[in-house]
Amino acid sequence: MIEVLLVTICLAVFPYPGSSIILESGNVDDYEVVYPQKLTALPKGAVQPKYEDAMQYEFKVNGEPVVLHLEKNKGLFSEDYSETHYSPDGREITTYPSVEDHCYYHGRIQNDADSTASISACDGLKGYFKLQGETYLIEPLELSDSEAHAVFKYENVEKEDEAPKMCGVTQNWESDESIKKASQLYLTPEQQRFPQRYIELAIVVDHGMYTKYSSNFKKIRKRVHQMVNNINEMYRPLNIAITLSLLDVWSEKDLITMQAVAPTTARLFGDWRETVLLKQKDHDHAQLLTDINFTGNTIGWAYMGGMCNAKNSVGIVKDHSSNVFMVAVTMTHEIGHNLGMEHDDKDKCKCEACIMSAVISDKPSKLFSDCSKDYYQTFLTNSKPQCIINAPLRTDTVSTPVSGNEFLEAGEECDCGSPSNPCCDAATCKLRPGAQCADGLCCDQCRFKKKRTICRRARGDNPDDRCTGQSADCPRNS
């Protein structure tokens, strides 16, 4: 039997329309101050770990209460995850820190089928969530009241400079005829069910970035972990699991000659990866995080279709923003090039601001366009990259079912947690006899609402969202 433990903090919200604040993510216009309320479901008699496998938080956004359901990203680190830095005399110092009880989560908003979330819960809640089609960021406020957080839209983060930020890859659509043709193909839903693939990622931090963060290894580690958690979430729709295998920080000096021309630095980094890094530890792909200013406002570069090649399975990314999410999007973009994805063409790809846009947009870029999916499918078919087929060593990337965590896991039909729920049997996580559903905007008294019942009122010019009569979810109408 499951007992639900409610840990109530304090729920409040204070909007600050038109005001500005300096946060870790940068200067922010228009934000709300919220005090999240934590709701935790634990088995009776269970010892609460420092960071639970599943958590729930309630707070308000634009005056409306939302419930954020989080589940620990157990596939974030490989089983043999390692960290390397260097002594003053150049010796490698490698450790294998315990990462079992880490603080990085993925999740969703209750009753919003299209929602996603990528959150660090290390010191308060920090990350992003998608709610009703809008991307919001959340992070703790440095106030005497430690529970205060700021919630704000992505586009309300002020630009750190006005110069456009570009990917340095300049190959065009005509550069590969097979890929060009792939962009014109129609993929059936069956074809778009991508096979499960795994990328064991190595991240290398250059000396300039190490110095930028005051030679604070812990601060860099935290930033990188947040970044990879975000990248992992963005690749989930493609059925790609990104696992951090190693973090190598050039704490004493750069181990290659850093150049302002991005492709030159990428070539040197690829040579170093092939001759040095791969001999230290096996991995599938390496990214170099740097503080160098590349020519042409370039913030990233990667080899096209280089995944699994010893020299070319690399990318380089400038740490161009204090906002971790923005740098994570750039790294996601460069990994996409290594997976065969070209830049989105504005005339051929129907996506206003997708991940593979050549220029960073003011609007959130956390989705792959249909063109990108076609490119990736073609890369899998033509190049058959072998290194990303095998799963990492970790065997517990699928969590043990935890009743009451609001995630439908293996073997569960419903997930309520409370024995008093009339629709769901908390002991078995199965629907009770006669019940069609237990939760959702189109579920009422354990039954699906009638077809055409309004489940979400229109916003702007969009039509009302209506139930299908066959599901508890409220689908978004176009």
UniProtKB/Swiss-Prot annotation:
Residues covered by the Peptidase M12B domain: 197-392
Short sequence motif named Cell attachment site, residue ranges: 459-461
Site feature location: Not glycosylated: N293
Binding site residues for Zn(2+): H333, H337, H343
Biological processes annotated in GO: proteolysis
Residues annotated as catalytic: E334
Keywords, comma-separated and alphabetical: Calcium, Cell adhesion impairing toxin, Disulfide bond, Glycoprotein, Hemorrhagic toxin, Hemostasis impairing toxin, Hydrolase, Metal-binding, Metalloprotease, Platelet aggregation inhibiting toxin, Protease, Pyrrolidone carboxylic acid, Secreted, Signal, Toxin, Zinc, Zymogen
Enzyme class, first EC level, given as a word: hydrolase
Chemical reaction(s) catalysed: Cleavage of 3-Asn-|-Gln-4, 10-His-|-Leu-11 and 14-Ala-|-Leu-15 in the insulin B chain, and the bond Z-Gly-Pro-|-Leu-Gly-Pro in a small molecule substrate of microbial collagenase
Additional comment: The disintegrin belongs to the medium disintegrin subfamily.
Name of this chain's protein: Zinc metalloproteinase/disintegrin
Organism: Protobothrops flavoviridis (Habu)
High-level lineage: Eukaryota, Metazoa, Chordata, Craniata, Vertebrata
